[in-house]
């Protein structure tokens, strides 16, 4: 667990060292930190970042093959975003699909921007924390976010019309910003307190 000088993380670190289960509290803290993340002058290659994140998520969860499909751009997509915000947004979308659904993530260039599209079939619809994260990412990058979802109850919730969510983000490229190296999938996979393990808690192996 990254502690730094945050008293909340120091407290959770002490609780974890004493054997307490801090995953639920750490999840709430990670989401709060992501939503409060300030603008950054450094860029993430969203194509590489998302590919690594989805690779780690696919290996971390107990799910059938094919529940997640990712199509990343072969070209870099540098966007000035805090890493913790992007990771939280992507993982919350993936979590929607984990109980019994499937997810599709695509990233492509488009007229000076990165275009990220998320689609998921979800028995529970879109969780309350997902849309604010996506909108915050769009706002920090100076972009746009469009999202929709079918109702959880009623006609669209039957077997022929399973509930779904969809979101599209258009995020301007930051081609002159310093580019951060993407994380390593193994670090996200094997660190018990990584965003993958914490934000997908309850579904990981």
Where are the regions a protein language model picked out?
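Flexible, glycine-/charge-rich segments associated with ATP-binding catalytic modules
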Residues: 2-13, 136-205
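Conserved micro-motifs of the catalytic ATP-binding
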Residues: 35-39, 78-81
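Conserved ATP-binding motifs of the histidine kinase catalytic
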Residues: 42, 75, 82, 86
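Short beta-to-alpha transition helix within the HATPase_c
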Residues: 42-59
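Conserved ATP-binding N-box helix of the HATPase_c
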Residues: 56, 82-105, 131-140
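Short conserved segments within the C-terminal catalytic ATPase subdomain
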Residues: 60-70
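Conserved catalytic submotifs in the C-terminal HATPase_c
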Residues: 69-77
């Amino acid at each position: 667990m990254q502690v730094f000088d945050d008293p909340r993380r120091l407290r959770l670190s002490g609780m974890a060292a004493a054997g307490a289960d801090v995953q639920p509290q750490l999840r709430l803290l990670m989401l709060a930190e992501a939503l409060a993340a300030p603008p950054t002058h450094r860029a993430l290659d969203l194509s590489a970042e998302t590919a690594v994140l989805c690779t780690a998520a696919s290996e971390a969860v107990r799910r059938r093959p094919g529940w997640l499909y990712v199509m990343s751009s072969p070209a870099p997509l540098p966007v000035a975003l805090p890493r913790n915000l992007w990771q939280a947004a992507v993982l919350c979308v993936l979590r929607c699909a984990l109980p019994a659904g499937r997810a599709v993530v695509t990233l492509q260039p488009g007229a000076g921007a990165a275009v990220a599209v998320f689609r998921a079939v979800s028995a529970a619809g879109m969780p309350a924390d997902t849309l604010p994260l996506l909108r915050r990412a769009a706002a920090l990058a100076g972009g746009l976010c469009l999202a929709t979802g079918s109702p959880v109850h009623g006609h669209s919730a039957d077997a022929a019309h399973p509930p779904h969510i969809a979101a599209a983000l258009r995020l301007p490229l930051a081609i002159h910003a310093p580019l951060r190296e993407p994380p390593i999938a193994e670090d996200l996979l094997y660190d018990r307190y990584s965003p993958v393990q914490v934000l997908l808690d309850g579904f990981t192996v």
